[in-house]
Amino acid sequence: MDQVEKPTRLPWWAWIRLPVFLAIAGAMMYPAARDFRRQAEHDVFAPSSSLVGIRRLSEYHSGLLMTPCNTEVYIFRGNEPGGKVLVLGGTHPNEPAGYVAAVVLMENLKIRKGTVFVVVPSNASGFSATEPQEAYPETYRIPLPGGGYRQFRMGSRFTNVLDGWPDPDVYLHYPSRQILSGNETRNLNRAFPGRPDGSRTEQVAYAITQLVLRERIDLVIDLHEASPEYPVVNALVFHERAQDLAALATLTMSTEGIDISLEPSPQNFHGLSHRELGDATPTFAVLMETACVVVGRLRGRTDADLVLLGNDPYYHAAARRGYVRVPYPENGIPMEVRVGRHMSGITALIDAMGQLYPEKGLEISGIPQFKDVVEKGVGAYLHLISVRPREKRQE
């Protein structure tokens, strides 16, 4: 009879290899997992004393409830009724001055008459990741005059792919049936007016459209940035209903030394906030663009300094050859110039609406203007934050 071989007895150290391997793998993965989780955390704000409530977009479209796109709607109201304004910041999360300008507005706004709604970040999902192959920094810090800093996220132009996967081969805009490339399905400024059963990005656009309708918003201001070589830059884009209002605002800005062009909203290019909100609602819909090298195609190294300073050697070379559409000074186009333009633009638009339509007038104060921001810096109008302020519900 063949003798049965006894199984070889493993040495003691063999029994602990798997637990040790798993422990080492877990320790290596923990920092990445921690950073991944942190990407879902929003920046912290300190709204002014004129804040009366904070809602969420899900209150205008329940489909966004319990999703990363369910961002806050900050409501500032005076003691007297008046016009209603909606400011969108962070529609494109890779355009930092549009986002920061909305934060500066909500942290400094004083209002006696009327109501101002601020949706920031408009595309919250887009701030949970940066854009592939763009080498954007994850964050940038704005120094405060008394010491310390405020840190803000840099995001992607598009909704996070995790909230919109997979992209179709072709994006068919609703309801125009305009055809765009597939990844534009995650571009919030190609999704208006949105639809309740569409993609996550279309649902965000739908919620904003419903906000405009339900709250009877008189004026929508969408804050953006564009590359210096882009044709529509340092511009105020307006729906035709807002033509007189936009023209008066640009005249006011010109008296402050701000060179800004007027651009009519194209009627055959759909999905844009100014086009679709103007068509789908009675509001005056406008969009402002400032020049930002971070979103340009000609830039070099893209780091936090470039976000803040806007000073790039390749753009200086391009400017000398006439390849850019705006003046590009020796010190670049820093954050304070870009944010300052937006702040003066917001004030000019609100004032223009009150002059042309007195029943829609607002009485506001506290908003820093272009010269103030350029002279003192953006940090002078941001608060040092140590804890997250408690949310207040609308009364």
What would you call each of these model-derived segments?
Residues P96-A97, R112-L251:
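Active-site/substrate-binding loop(s) of hydrolase catalytic cores
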Residues L88-H92, F192-G198, G332-M335:
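Second-shell loop/turn segments in exported
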